[in-house]
Amino acid sequence: MCGRTSCHLPREVLTRACAYQDRQGRRRLPQWRDPDKYCPSYNKSPQSSSPVLLSRLHFEKDADSSDRIIIPMRWGLVPSWFKESDPSKLQFNTTNCRSDTIMEKQSFKVPLGKGRRCVVLADGFYEWQRCQGTNQRQPYFIYFPQIKTEKSGGNDASDSSDNKEKVWDNWRLLTMAGIFDCWEAPGGECLYSYSIITVDSCRGLSDIHSRMPAILDGEEAVSKWLDFGEVATQEALKLIHPIDNITFHPVSPVVNNSRNNTPECLAPADLLVKKEPKANGSSQRMMQWLATKSPKKEVPDSPKKDASGLPQWSSQFLQKSPLPAKRGATSSFLDRWLKQEKEDEPMAKKPNS
């Protein structure tokens, strides 16, 4: 299953991370709908709002079905046929949608038949592993392996500054397949909401949980899932299956409480360290990077700050783990990522909203 995610990037940075090629091969950025409803967070739970990619054709009849927009949607699909005046009165859970019953339940079958396919965006998602012999559960943060890419431009004068701006060379967002619907409230306002499709876990995650989100790995998979005008439902459903191209690390139990919204939620934790260590040099640099990517605001449950102004972490970079977490290229990427200073300054702009 998938019941908690992180999506902390400011709006303008998130937009750059979603750059894509249109049918003519031009590099483009998706446009926003209801941008003010987007709230970055390290700890998103059901019924909160998350950014979702979908085809522009859902809103503009003359649009190309391959064109994309981003819209914040409520997590937990509210069917269009729901009769109550309050969506919180929905009696069944629509946070996730099992791939094996997607064509059996009206809540999902109807919007899927209308082509209401979307891609849920996140840094990654959290999952909890039950510790043997205890009632405790260890949280993990799960995401795409991160590989540093070359920036565009080089010595090619034909590359405009606009195209360079549309090339993303940092954290790769997790792209999860979803279904959305539009419920019309008694007052006439439409509520857009979604459900994340889940599949059996891949081998690498099966020790943590038996289910995982249906992850769309690569631009082609994302394009086919979104383009309901060209790709039929049955063809699109072939994209829904477990993938192995993921990595993970344990994180602090601070993420257990959905009210906690700090960088510590996704910071790697050392399971062998019982004593709370102070932030080391690498973790401080990661904290500084994360701080530039999200709007600054005071959170009641934020950890206390030391003299340097940085929160004291109860975690540090993963050294050993009882599970075979994939490190390799991702570890190398993170090492280089942490050393970035001035290269990241252009991406540290605050959102316009």
Swiss-Prot record:
Compositional bias annotation for Basic and acidic residues: 295-307, 336-353
Q: Where is this region: Disordered?
A: 292-353
Activity control: Formation and reversal of DNA-protein cross-link depends on DNA context. Catalyzes formation of the thiazolidine linkage in presence of abasic sites in single-stranded DNA. Mediates the reversal of the thiazolidine cross-link in presence of double stranded DNA.
GO molecular function list: DNA-(abasic site) binding; peptidase activity; protein-DNA covalent cross-linking activity; single-stranded DNA binding
Looking at the Swiss-Prot or TrEMBL record, what is one Pfam family this protein matches?
SRAP
Where are the Thiazolidine linkage to a ring-opened DNA abasic site residues found in this chain?
A: C2
Q: Which GO terms describe its biological process?
A: DNA damage response; double-strand break repair via alternative nonhomologous end joining; interstrand cross-link repair; positive regulation of isotype switching; protein-DNA covalent cross-linking repair; proteolysis; somatic hypermutation of immunoglobulin genes
Q: What is this protein called?
A: Abasic site processing protein HMCES
Organism whose genome encodes this protein: Mus musculus
